[in-house]
Curated annotation (Swiss-Prot):
Organism from which the protein derives: Bacillus velezensis (strain DSM 23117 / BGSC 10A6 / LMG 26770 / FZB42) (Bacillus amyloliquefaciens subsp. plantarum)
Any one Pfam family match given in the protein's UniProt record, by short name: YbjQ_1
Cited InterPro entries: UPF0145_dom_sf, UPF0145_YbjQ-like
Taxonomic superkingdom: Bacteria
Alphabetical list of Gene3D superfamilies matching this protein: Hypothetical protein apc22750. Chain B (3.30.110.70)
Protein name: UPF0145 protein RBAM_010660
Family to which the UniProt record says this protein belongs: Belongs to the UPF0145 family.
Amino acid sequence: MIMTTTETIAGKQITEVKGLVTSSIVQSRHIGKDLLAGLKSVVGGELKSYTEMLEDSKKAVKERLIREAEQLGANAIVGLRFELTAGQNTSELIGYGTAVTAESIKKNKPL
C-alpha cells in the first residue's frame, strides 16, 4: 500500500478515487511514566515513554487506514494527514486520507 502526504504519486496515475479513510486511537498515559516524564521535562530532553507511545499509536492508525483502504479496493492513500490532541491523561491520534487506485504510467517506447 502506497501512503503519501502528497496529492499525487510520482510515476503513477490516479485512476479512481475510492473515498475517505479515517482512523483514530486514544491512549491513556501510565501514571508512573507520567511522573518520570514530569521530572524529565524539568531538566530537558526527550520524553522517551511518550515518543514510544506516539510511535505505537501512529503504527496502529496506519495499519487501520490500510485495512480500510483495502476494503474499498484501493492500492494507495494520498493526502495523508495526522493530528494529535493531548489531554491531561490521554492522547488521541487521528489519521485520514483519500483511498485511491493508482496505476503505473505507461511510457511509449521509442521507435
